[in-house]
Every structure is written in structure tokens, then in C-alpha cells.
Regions:
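Short beta-strand element of the alpha/beta-hydrolase
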Residues: 25-42
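Conserved alpha/beta-hydrolase
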Residues: 48-77
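Conserved acidic catalytic loop of the alpha/beta-hydrolase fold
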Residues: 88-106
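Flexible "cap/lid" loop of the alpha/beta hydrolase fold
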Residues: 116-123, 127, 131-160
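Active-site nucleophile elbow and catalytic-triad environment of alpha/beta-hydrolase enzymes
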Residues: 138, 193-211, 243-247
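Short beta-strand/loop motif that positions the catalytic acidic residue
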Residues: 215, 221-223
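Conserved loop-alpha-helix segment in the C-terminal half of the alpha/beta-hydrolase fold
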Residues: 225-262
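Catalytic active-site module of serine/aspartate enzymes centered on a nucleophile-bearing elbow/loop
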Residues: 247, 254-291
Length: 291
């Protein structure tokens, strides 16, 4: 198996670590290659998330594909880009990762806001061989609600920076995946939160319906049927709907060329069912080997 560890230089001059594993058609994956450990892992489990999800995805694909993995979300939290995380710069960063890996053409997989990044990549570049969007609707995406959530989060981060937050409940107080948003405190810095406000502000004029005509590569979207999040007033008082637009527009999406998968009963944080969907679809689309 071919292996390499690289660095890609991003739009602000910072670098992100890139792990390359396997051989075959190239798949860019915005996932964390390193399993999360310690208290952070327990926090992820509290939210119903596998701390080793990225690693498991890489290992599950590397015997049939050339996987290019990079923890972009972790990077922007370590190296915030409060004024420059625009859609254009985001796409430029993804292309910089592909360039560092020597990938002229490649498939892309992203989950949640990094799936939305993949849609921007597909619209702004002709280098995609396939697009996989997990937990973000290709049509009727929650751009306005997410701006309100990110703006509220930024306000909370600014307030938290000037005064200590109230004690948080113990990690075991809520069942996995059932977090009470009224008790959650912001632990991010103002710079970390402002970058997402910058991103969603720039996306307010984005017409995802018009964008469909610009998509030429094979594409798959999947959501959990329970992926609906209602935030209380502290977080903007909005409902971020991920599953409903996909279910509601399923026939239209399929007519537009999307393969659509709805995972019954799963919510936004439960991404462990990705591999059984992702690998067969990539193999049939790109020609990578099956297990």
C-alpha cells in the first residue's frame, strides 16, 4: 500500500497535514486521520460520534482507492481565519490539498459543513470525478439558519471571553446524541467562531438550485432521517433542517442526477454508517476495487 505524509499550504499561508494512503482512483476526504483520545473522545461519544471515524473511513477505503485525508475542520480551529474563510478561499484550500497530493482529478467526500464545501468545490472547479455530500442538503440548504446559529455562537464566544462560563453538566448527564442545547457552553474563541460567520455571510446569495446546472460529475448525498436540530434562543432560536429538504426534494434530486440515501433513525452526529454507503458507490462510480 502506498503511503505518504505531506503538507499543503493554504490561502492564509498556514499549512495543513495531509495523509495519503492506498492506490487507485483518488478520493479527497476532509476527515481527521487521527483517532481522538482522552476527554475530547468522551465528549464526542457524548454526542454519539465515533472518535476514530476518520481513521476508520481511511482504512476502509485505502485498499481500493488512493485516499487523501486532511483534518480541515481541526485546522481552522487551530489556525482560525476569521476574516478570510470565504467560499472562494475554502475551495482554494481544498484544491491546494489536491495539488499537494498530485491529484489533477479527484472525488471529494465531506460531512456537514464540509459537504457544503464540496458543493462549492464542484461549482467552482472542473476537477471533480465524483462528489459525496453527507448531512448537508444539495437543494434548499440551511444557509440562512446557519448564519443565525453561527452569529449567535460568535456572540456567546465574545461574552464567554470576557467572563467565565457557568459550570457545564457532567458528560454523562445526557444520553448519547440527546444534548440539551440550553446547557451547552461555548468553548471556542471569538476568532474561531467569527470565521464561520464570515463563511455563511458570504453564502447568503448562493442559489443552490441554480447551481445544479453546473454539476457534471456523479454525485451522492445521504442524510439521517432524524437530522433536524432545534436551537434555543441563546443559539439563534432557529431550526436547522437537514433531512427534510433531502426527503422533500428526493425525486427532484434524483432527476437532477443525484443518488439519494436516507438513513432511517440517524441524526446529525451519527456518521458511523458512512462506509457501507460510500465504498460501494465509489467503486461503481470510479472503478475502485470492492472488498
Amino acid at each position: 500500500m502506498h503511503e505518504a505524509n505531506l503538507n499543503a499550504r493554504l490561502h492564509d499561508g498556514s499549512t495543513v497535514a495531509v495523509e495519503v494512503r492506498g492506490s487507485g482512483p483518488t478520493v479527497l476526504m476532509a476527515v481527521n486521520p487521527r483517532p481522538v483520545e482522552g476527554p475530547a473522545a468522551e465528549e464526542l461519544r457524548r454526542w454519539g460520534t465515533d472518535p476514530a471515524l476518520g481513521r476508520n473511513l481511511i482504512d476502509g477505503l485505502a485498499d481500493g482507492f488512493r485516499v487523501v485525508a486532511f483534518d480541515y475542520e481541526g485546522h481552522v480551529l487551530q489556525e482560525p481565519k476569521p476574516d478570510t474563510l470565504t467560499p472562494g478561499n475554502l475551495v482554494g484550500d481544498l484544491l491546494a490539498v489536491a495539488d499537494a497530493a498530485g491529484a489533477g482529478q479527484f472525488a471529494y467526500y465531506g460531512y456537514s459543513w464540509l459537504a457544503m464545501a464540496g458543493l462549492q468545490l464542484a461549482v467552482r472547479s472542473d476537477r471533480l470525478t465524483a462528489l459525496v455530500m453527507g448531512a448537508y442538503p444539495p437543494l434548499d440548504g440551511p444557509y440562512e439558519p446557519m448564519l443565525r446559529v453561527t452569529a449567535a455562537t460568535h456572540e456567546l464566544a465574545v461574552a464567554s471571553a470576557s467572563s467565565p462560563p457557568a459550570p457545564r453538566p457532567a458528560a454523562g448527564d445526557d444520553p448519547a446524541g440527546e444534548v440539551d442545547w440550553s446547557t451547552v457552553e461555548v468553548t471556542l474563541t471569538p476568532a474561531q467562531t467569527r470565521q464561520f460567520v464570515t463563511l455563511y455571510q458570504a453564502l447568503q446569495g448562493f442559489d443552490d438550485r441554480a447551481a445544479q446546472a453546473q454539476l457534471g460529475c456523479p454525485r451522492l448525498c445521504f442524510v439521517g432521517s432524524a437530522d433536524e436540530i432545534t436551537y434555543d434562543e441563546r443559539w439563534g432560536g432557529v431550526r436547522v433542517s437537514v433531512a427534510d429538504p433531502v426527503v422533500r426534494h428526493r425525486v427532484e434530486l434524483e432527476a437532477l442526477g443525484w443518488q439519494v440515501e436516507v438513513l432511517e433513525g440517524l441524526d446529525h452526529m451519527q456518521a458511523t454508517q458512512v462506509l457501507p454507503i460510500l465504498r460501494p458507490w465509489l467503486a461503481s462510480t470510479l472503478g475502485g476495487s470492492r472488498p
